[in-house]
Swiss-Prot record:
<dbReference type="InterPro" id="IPR046358">
    <property type="entry name" value="Flagellin_C"/>
</dbReference>
<comment type="subunit">
    <text>The core of the flagellum consists of several antigenically related polypeptides.</text>
</comment>
<dbReference type="InterPro" id="IPR001029">
    <property type="entry name" value="Flagellin_N"/>
</dbReference>
<dbReference type="InterPro" id="IPR001492">
    <property type="entry name" value="Flagellin"/>
</dbReference>
<comment type="function">
    <text>Component of the core of the flagella.</text>
</comment>
<dbReference type="GO" id="GO:0055040">
    <property type="term" value="C:periplasmic flagellum"/>
</dbReference>
<keyword id="KW-0325">Glycoprotein</keyword>
<comment type="similarity">
    <text>Belongs to the bacterial flagellin family.</text>
</comment>
<dbReference type="InterPro" id="IPR042187">
    <property type="entry name" value="Flagellin_C_sub2"/>
</dbReference>
<keyword id="KW-0574">Periplasm</keyword>
<dbReference type="Pfam" id="PF00700">
    <property type="entry name" value="Flagellin_C"/>
</dbReference>
<protein>
    <recommendedName>
        <fullName>Flagellar filament 31.3 kDa core protein</fullName>
    </recommendedName>
</protein>
<keyword id="KW-0975">Bacterial flagellum</keyword>
<dbReference type="GO" id="GO:0005198">
    <property type="term" value="F:structural molecule activity"/>
</dbReference>
<dbReference type="Pfam" id="PF00669">
    <property type="entry name" value="Flagellin_N"/>
</dbReference>
Amino acid sequence: MIINHNMSAMYSNRVLGVTNLAQAKDMEKLSSGMKINRAGDDASGLAVSEKMRSQIRGLNQASRNAQNGISFIQVSEGYLQETTDIMHRIRELAVQSSNGIYSDEDRMQIQVEVSQLVAEVDRIASHAQFNGMNMLTGRFARATGENTVTGSMWLHIGANMDQRMQVFIGTMTAMAVGVREIGSEKVMSIAAPDDANRAIGTIDEGLKKINKQRADLGAYQNRLEMTVKGLDVAAENTQAAESTIRDTDMAKQMVDFTKNRILAQAGTAMLAQANVTTQNVLTLLQ
């Protein structure tokens, strides 16, 4: 029997320290709900988890971007609906003026209304804005022979670089849709039956252009709606994968915590018992 080194107490103390450390980690994981709280808990798991978190946030923002794009398209289509209604009215007046029963004075009165409607087409084009950006004046138009200055609307609809799409909106001024002469302020004339007759064909071409643009906007919107669904599903699945890596399994962790708590209590008792054992040496000295 020796008294300088109590090996039983030293062993019990070492094991108790390990158990207390494990118990502290269990408490940390249970209180935070995460099994990876620092790089030391799982270095590779932390790296993968952080990449996934970045991707999840990117996917969520991309979904919001796509939803904002849908709003942009809906606003544009709303303005074009107004322009379409005006064009229908101008066409109706042109058909009316083509009829030979009207006098020149009658057609003059019809022309007054047409002039006001054409001015309204220009007003809509110049005032149609989204977040301060003009939408129908050619800012987002495709490059053509007449229009080489373009700036299509880019919508970033992915979590990573270059995952984006373009939205094009043509010029929808009165001149662009044919109800005002190119290069002048002169309004389409329906002052004579022949003029009114030709105007009907011109207006039909303008309506084709507007309807084509509205159809394009509808296609953009349908695509973006599907994009939002896909992004939301991707974010959800990535979140589930990240949760598997990083989140604590509370039931399993509670089992480990209970085990370590019992071991800590037993270790404390055994350490006390080991210290008592050395005191028995005193009986030999009495």
